[in-house]
Amino acid sequence: MKIRCLILLCLALILINYDSHAGKPADQEEVHGLHLVHGRRTMKIPFELRSNLIIVPVRINKSEVLRFILDTGVGPTILTDAAIAQKLGMKSIRTMKIDGIGKGEAIPADITIGNRLTMGAMQSLKHNIVVLDSDILRLSELVGTSIHGIFGYEVFNKFVVTIDFQRQLLTLTVPKKYEYSAKQGDRFPIVIEKTKPYLEGITVVNNDTELPIRVVLDTGAGHALMLNTTTNNVQLPQKVMKAQLGVGLGGVINGHIGRIPKVRIGEYELTDVLTTFPDSNAFGMKIATNAPQREGNLGGEFLRRFKVTFNYDAGYVVLKPNKKRFYDKFEHDMSGMDVRAKGMNFRQYYVEHILEGSPAHFAGLQENDELLFINNQSVEDLEMAELNRILQQKEGKEMRLVIRRNGRLVLANFALKRMI
């Protein structure tokens, strides 16, 4: 269930190349681009961490507080709810097509100009925002709370950004006022290409072979590691399972899930890392010929094990291990069902997909079943993250479900199984 959310963002927007300040003089960007109000040098703002995604409070023009995902993998600011743009009277100057990963066609979107965007003490007075014509991503259903949009590069390019996953605190600092010290962690060089941060100092050990790779550091992907088998030397592990990895702007993303025995960054080493491998038809075939070379990306399930500081201006990232989370096991759903959250408060859970040969499959669960109770607990009392944890607790753990199917109550029982 979790992987659908985990891989979605790193793939869905990978082909967007749009400069929200294109054509603006440098001095005008200083006035109207992202900045901290009242000459502040730094600001802190709490964030929510859901499904390993960073969710921050944002306002557009005179809107109520909106929830945006902070995503290093996306270039422009994207509003996924066209109804909000219409309500706010956002001015569209032209339409565009967004090509995504998957089997579908390009998605229409509008480019709006002259917007005021604020996040705490950060603001932009004339901000360009891309508005999707339809909510094809369905991010709210995946995360289990209202999600209204995504942004990233414009923030990371303007400030030194420190993400404290343990305290769920985001710090923005004006680059000229930021000073690095060794106690903040180890520095690793990154290169910014086409709005994305690339890290080269990483090694994976797979099938008894050490392989240096180049990856995107992607805070908008909830998974741990994604590898692209269409590039040289990247191979599937000996044990993998086929899976529907997610749904991007272009449709369904299929592939495999496996484990990489070791992933090493400098002196830091993590083992048995859960890794996704998108099919070449869904991933490699759609990468533009002039796209920067890479073997994959590191997402939130990996990054949350560190306190992370991105310094695009100086060209490095700082990693400091989170002692409480660094050695957490990488676990995948053990039920075999993907679930979507719906309803007013996103506390109604429906089965979206059943993995063939999984415990849920053998127990007779079907797509569109509504979960009502799990082990005598009403699912209305559970957030999506809590439900995810229940379904990946422990191999052999018995699950007793009450579901609604076509207006009838149905009982289903199965034991969790570690399928990968």
Regions found by a protein language model. Name each.
Residues I7-I14:
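Bacterial N-terminal signal peptides
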Residues C5, Y18-I420:
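Pepsin/retropepsin-fold aspartyl endopeptidases
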Residues M1-I7:
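Bacterial N-terminal signal peptides that target proteins for export
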